[in-house]
């Protein structure tokens, strides 16, 4: 979109100006920066644009960008004048975002529709397709002008309940005879308690929101003494089983767990121990775990008598903590990353919802909701707003 590309270019120029140091010799790069600044100043200085202010009223925004004399040494006054001039330009661009963002669109747009915004874009006259915030580049991705960017993400795991109740043979009211799972996963963390009331391994999956790779750690937490099991396929009015558990993590050994990393249903890597692992590109982590077995049962406490028959008084249990330390994936509208925070902050200050004369209904005013949480009829509108704010958030 032309307004986003203009913001990108002004942000890049601001960074170049800030990299200059006053009262020092100016070399070729510095001279080029001053020339680029002066080119915009000569076109925009004194221009007035009627755009939306922070209370959504049409107000005159005047650009104050005096031309800077070219010399071998940049004075402090000239450096401050350049910095203030670019801030004046950002005031106009912020107002342009509020003005253009108030206009609904039903498809991906590449050109500003508001006449005053288009006038400002043409007067500034510089553009750049690339922003340091990958969410600002998503409209370029949608129009096939750019590929998705590979970036660290904050929420590789899909939000899911990990509940299972599988009876086998005889059962009792303390969890005997059941294989059971009770757990949750979201963001970068999954915690699952495995109750093994009879022989056999238990398998469960942690699904990824998007295919990603990175580093994860697996460790055991202290297991609860009593835990209410899910009903599984039983009628909802059944009385749930309260399993009486014994934490057997002290005898948990290498080989009692198998981790398989899967991509599109195909195993692309595996491990058989706890600890920190570098995992390959995958969209699912499948974990098979067996806290207790026949060998361990040979020297078992009396609480585990008749465990092979499924009628033990207490059940072997472990709690597994899965933590994805870091993960990288192609940025998409539904992925969360560090780039959301700064833009969302601006949505509470410079770009509050009240500063838009019209805003998408039934949408929480955050970057995540604008990018992926809007109703279908408003999604292109909300994404336009989000991408413009994301581009603006890169300014110093």
Swiss-Prot record:
Subcellular location: Virion
Keywords: Capsid protein, Intermediate capsid protein, Virion
GO molecular function, one term: structural molecule activity
GO CC annotation: viral envelope; viral intermediate capsid
GO biological process, one term: fusion of virus membrane with host plasma membrane
Chief place where the protein resides: virion
Domain of life: Viruses
Alphabetized InterPro entries for the sequence: Rotavirus_A/C_VP6
Function: Intermediate capsid protein that self assembles to form an icosahedral capsid with a T=13 symmetry, which consists of 230 trimers of VP6, with channels at each of its five-fold vertices. This capsid constitutes the middle concentric layer of the viral mature particle. The innermost VP2 capsid and the intermediate VP6 capsid remain intact following cell entry to protect the dsRNA from degradation and to prevent unfavorable antiviral responses in the host cell during all the replication cycle of the virus.
Oligomer and partners: Homotrimer. Interacts with the inner capsid protein VP2. Interacts with the outer capsid glycoprotein VP7.
Family of this protein: Belongs to the rotavirus VP6 family.
Protein name: Intermediate capsid protein VP6
Species for this entry: Rotavirus X (isolate RVX/Human/Bangladesh/NADRV-B219/2002/GXP[X])
């Amino acid at each position: 979109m032309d307004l986003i590309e203009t913001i990108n270019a002004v942000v890049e120029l601001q960074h170049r100006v800030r990299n200059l140091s006053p009262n020092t010799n100016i070399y070729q790069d510095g001279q080029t920066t001053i020339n680029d600044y002066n080119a915009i100043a000569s076109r925009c200085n004194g221009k007035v644009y009627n755009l939306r202010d922070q209370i959504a009223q049409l107000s005159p925004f005047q650009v104050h960008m005096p031309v800077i004399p070219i010399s071998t040494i940049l004075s402090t006054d000239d450096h401050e004048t350049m910095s203030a001039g670019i801030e004046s330009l950002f005031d106009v661009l912020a107002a342009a975002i509020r003005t253009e963002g108030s206009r609904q669109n039903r498809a991906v747009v590449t050109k500003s529709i508001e006449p005053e915004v288009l006038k400002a874009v043409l007067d500034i006259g510089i553009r750049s397709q690339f922003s340091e915030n990958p969410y600002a580049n998503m409209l370029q991705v949608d129009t096939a002008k750019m590929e998705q960017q590979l970036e660290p993400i904050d929420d590789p795991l899909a939000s899911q309940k990990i509940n299972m109740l599988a009876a086998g043979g005889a059962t009792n009211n303390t969890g005997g005879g059941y294989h059971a799972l009770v757990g949750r996963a979201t963001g970068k963390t999954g915690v699952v308690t495995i109750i093994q009331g009879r022989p056999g391994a238990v398998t469960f999956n942690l699904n990824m929101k998007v295919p990603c790779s990175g580093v994860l750690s697996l460790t055991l937490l202290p297991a609860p003494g009593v835990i209410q099991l899910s009903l599984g396929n039983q009628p909802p009015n059944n009385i749930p089983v309260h399993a009486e558990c014994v934490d057997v993590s002290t005898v948990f050994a290498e080989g009692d767990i198998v981790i398989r990393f899967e991509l599109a249903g195909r195993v692309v890597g595996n491990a058989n121990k706890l600890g920190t692992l570098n995992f390959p590109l995958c969209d699912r982590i499948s974990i098979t775990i067996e806290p207790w077995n026949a060998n361990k049962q040979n020297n078992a406490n009396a609480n585990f008598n008749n465990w092979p028959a499924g009628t033990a008084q207490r059940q072997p249990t472990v709690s597994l903590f899965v933590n994805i330390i870091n993960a990288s994936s192609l940025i998409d509208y539904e992925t969360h990353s560090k780039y959301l925070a700064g833009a969302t902050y601006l949505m509470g200050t410079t770009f509050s919802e009240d500063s838009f004369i019209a805003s998408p209904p039934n949408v929480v005013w955050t970057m995540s909701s604008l990018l992926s949480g809007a109703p279908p009829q408003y999604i292109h509108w909300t994404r336009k707003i989000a991408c413009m704010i994301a581009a603006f958030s890169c300014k110093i």
